Amino acid sequence: MSFISETIIIGTGGAVRLTGSGLGCSDWPLCTPDSLVPILEVQGIHGIIEFGNRLMTGVVGIIALAVVLLVLHLFSGKRGLVNALWFALGGIVAAVATFAIATPLHFPASPIALAVLLVAVIAAAVRSVRTTPARRDLVLLAWLTLIGVVAQALVGGITVLTGLNPFIVGFHYTSSLLLVCITAAFLVRLKTSPGPRERAVPVWFAAVTHVTGLALAVTIVFGVLTTGSGPHSGDADVLRHGFDATVLAHVHSWPGYILAALVLFLTVSAWVLRLEPRRWLLVLVLAILVQVGVGIWQAREGLPPLLVGTHMVLASLSAAAYTVVVLRLKRPVPVDA
């Protein structure tokens, strides 16, 4: 559920940007200075779309919190669960106190209070990972997801308060991709036996796989910059990066083609050598090829919102598939009979 919700919120966040609804709610955490929810007669459909995305953040956060509590219950026992709840209560109290102090001083109370809550969540995560006797990998990944969701809420608020600064918007999207990868890693490790792991592929194959990851990262970064320079900035009055979108589109495509070639090479090699990650490489190569096709199509059609949104979601699925491939480079060490 956490993986699905993280992927969905990339789609809803993309819808906010592609419909020009980024400032549909002009304030944060309220929609307007006087109202928590949008007023249809004032904000129109843009306010509804932006507020819907904010509600989705709450859903993602609840699911992430539920995963943390479930993992702690399974692997830390009652004591670990109670400790986490005490940290949560302390974080909420500290955040409320911070808000109460910052408001009369005319400081940005909401972002500061949320930052205090984020620190409390990080502290709880560190303690949980250190004290959990088993499956610390799952505990860590669950906490990282929750930390990421809280951090994303803070970044989302800053995005609105800065008038959709294109660099912050790009960071917001990239961070969402990382959360999708973390939740994908959680699912893989959940189905993997604990204990020591050993390399399951040749050294050269692992090296090429990591180079492929670099190509994927570069492709995503230039894709974010390209979108920030194009027509979909999130609001008609918001300034873009100032870069030439046409030039960036070509630059974005170069590492994309390199990425496709590397993934195709890895896929063929994995199937010929019958290596562990071969099935997920097949998923990855199909995702990348579809991604390349959608990218070319949207460029030729003048960047229609639906295709751009599809391109954004496919990028998250490609990153998730690559994460699974990397984790399949190793396997649990066989236990001697």
List each model region and its residues:
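N-terminal signal-anchor transmembrane alpha helix
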Residues: 1-20, 215-225
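Membrane-interface helix caps and helix-loop-helix hairpins in membrane proteins
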Residues: 100-108, 158-171, 299-306
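Individual transmembrane alpha-helix segments
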Residues: 41-63, 248, 252
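Hydrophobic cores of alpha-helical transmembrane segments in multi-pass inner/ER membrane proteins
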Residues: 59-67, 113-125, 176-191, 255-265, ...
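Transmembrane alpha-helices
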Residues: 70, 74-134
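Membrane-interfacial catalytic/cofactor-binding modules of polytopic membrane enzymes
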Residues: 217-260, 264-271
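Membrane-interfacial loop-to-transmembrane alpha-helix junctions, especially the N-terminal start
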Residues: 77-89, 133-146, 205-212, 275-285, ...
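Extracytosolic (periplasmic/ER-lumenal) interhelical loops and adjacent juxtamembrane/interface segments
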Residues: 17-51, 228, 236-241
